[in-house]
Amino acid sequence: MAKPAKRVAVTGAAGQIAYSLLFRIANGDLLGKDQPVILQLLDLPQAQAAVKGVVMELDDCAFPLLAGVVITDDPKVAFKDADVALLVGARPRSKGMERKDLLSANAEIFTVQGAALNEVASRDVKVLVVGNPANTNAYIAMKSAPDLPKKNFTAMLRLDHNRALSQLAAKSGKPVASIEKLAVWGNHSPTMYPDFRFATAEGESLLKLINDDAWNRDTFIPTVGKRGAAIIEARGLSSAASAANAAIDHVRDWVLGTNGKWVTMGIPSDGSYGIPEDIIYGVPVTCENGEYKRVEGLEIDAFSREKMDGTLAELLEERDGVAHLLK
């Protein structure tokens, strides 16, 4: 007996990240190879023709799991009964634009989308914000959806997590799949703190294996933090395929579980690790039965505290920068 289809809403559906994302969702990479999906695609009125072109390609793949597609410029149509909402679309920073202007432009988008989710989405909707500034956009959406549980709102730090995994594998010579217990703390921005103090590869401590404080401080942390900029520099375009891959990883693990393995998600703080409540902050989590659970009780040394507080300061500044826009 086929499972009932799940509704997956994707915003920014005509964009580059969505182009790398939609075919994989339709192929079963997001929710499982036995789970039919209905894609509900949102983009601006002027992008509707482009979205139709993408849907023609989706049709031409004849995906067995794709049970339907909705194309719209109305958030209330896109989010209707959505089980998963991938908020990919955001206002990009244009030349000469101040960060506060970027925050305001996105606050407008994410208050509207949060309110629409509040009104029409499934009460168990799993929301992942990919569009930057992702943590603060997720915070705005969460605050605009008072009737939905706060825990439903997450921000994507999985790209940073995957970038850090790849750097650690290259440095240690260990297979990337063998690395466990990596954490990335804070904001999805260059201030984030990738932390491998607890990490192991094939049961060995990575800290002992690598044993190079200077590399951690001067190479590893900045490389992970500035990787997005390095890709733009090299490619002339932002990292779309790797971002889409990270979004798939994030939601798949949230829905299907991590078997006790740590992954990083930006989630609303409960006050632990000295992070004020409700701030959407990257922390290590495990996932089981469709729920994430933060890894608790990790020791925070002086260097880590400084890094964690630095990225928190940026998040607090962003929160305060949009406070007047939230009712």
UniProtKB/Swiss-Prot annotation:
Q: Which InterPro entries match?
A: L-lactate/malate_DH, Lactate/malate_DH_C, Lactate/malate_DH_N, Lactate_DH/Glyco_Ohase_4_C, Malate_DH_type2, NAD(P)-bd_dom_sf
Cite a single GO MF annotation.
L-malate dehydrogenase (NAD+) activity
Write the record's keywords in alphabetical order, separated by commas. NAD, Oxidoreductase, Tricarboxylic acid cycle
Entry's transmembrane regions: none
According to the lineage, what is the superkingdom?
Answer: Bacteria
Q: Where is the active site?
A: 188
Query: Could you tell me the EC number(s) of this protein?
Result: 1.1.1.37
BP terms from Gene Ontology: malate metabolic process; tricarboxylic acid cycle
List ligand-binding residues for substrate: 93, 99, 132, 163
Q: Which residues bind NAD(+)?
A: 12-18, 106, 113, 130-132
* Pfam family for this entry, one: Ldh_1_N
Q: Could you say which enzyme class this protein belongs to? A: oxidoreductase
Reactions catalysed, as given in the entry: (S)-malate + NAD(+) = oxaloacetate + NADH + H(+)
Please tell me whether the keyword Oxidoreductase is annotated for this protein. yes
* Keyword Kinase belongs to the record: no
Q: What does this protein do?
A: Catalyzes the reversible oxidation of malate to oxaloacetate.
Similarity comment text for this entry: Belongs to the LDH/MDH superfamily. MDH type 2 family.
Q: What is this protein called?
A: Malate dehydrogenase 1
* Species this protein is from: Burkholderia thailandensis (strain ATCC 700388 / DSM 13276 / CCUG 48851 / CIP 106301 / E264)
What's the gene? Answer: mdh1
